Amino acid sequence: MKITGGRGYVKFDLENGYIMKAEGEMLIDNTFLVYKDTMKSWEVPHNNEKVSDEQVENIIKTSCKMMNKNTIHLIFE
């Protein structure tokens, strides 16, 4: 998975054609707060497919495993 973003969003690229954009905000100490309730849809061309709670949880788990002292830390709320 690739994780990219900007000041008010983060994108989770599953590297299989599926990308999810979530809103959030940059905090202090290299931390980004991800608004979990905005993780509802895939980017085009999969925007008509439903996102399951299990898929969201898998993205969160994978993201947490990828974090280390050299990356921005994500907090999901």
Indicate where each model-derived feature is located.
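Acidic, low-complexity intrinsically disordered segments
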Residues: 31-77
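Amphipathic, interaction-prone secondary-structure segments
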Residues: 1-27
